[in-house]
């Protein structure tokens, strides 16, 4: 479908869509008010699981990627039950430590290739397949958004105590969102591995975490399409800017994150922000009031109408 694009452009587009999947993985937990910094760790789990199955066990590509996503989801479920009882900064630090444990473990095990990573991964995922997966995930998100699960997650985000008082099992839905986030991050890791053909622990760095977190904060937690479009827009803009240095990218995204948190803390898809912008655009312009054309009529008298 995208054969008219040159190989480099297809590779860049695939990387942007992988980032979109990672942003969606954060969008899931944002729905219930959870700030998870373990996304990169789950991405590494999915990438290494699928790559090892393909290179060592000779699994086909699609089952290997699916298995990697499932392993990441299982790990998210297990460890999510341990850290999701935390709140605020403690939850953020707990999930960050969890993600770093996964990455450091991968870097130090010999059967994962150690610091050198894994090479020789089959490169047989097309850009069209990745586009289809992102759209399919979006359709699922829309269905969940309209379901009771989506309403429960949003209720938890607004006020946990009120949600619990309404009969919503807060712990269960937070764990469900964390598990789904791990699945999407593992899926993104698998697709990236089969797009580049090589992976190493250095890919899952703090700089990448800052980039994905910045994209997620810019998009906000209200519209899944906003997450995808933000990832695409920033990715395309980055290509035009031509920034390739990791430190420069980290500074760029970090500064962007600070600006967004100050100006639009709820993201650009915040309904209140959109309503204000729409109201200002549609509100009619009122010029200076014109002086009355006739004197007020006496009490009880009808005004004079001139035709």
Where on the chain are the PLM-derived regions?
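Transmembrane alpha-helices and adjacent helix-loop boundaries
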Residues: 1-307
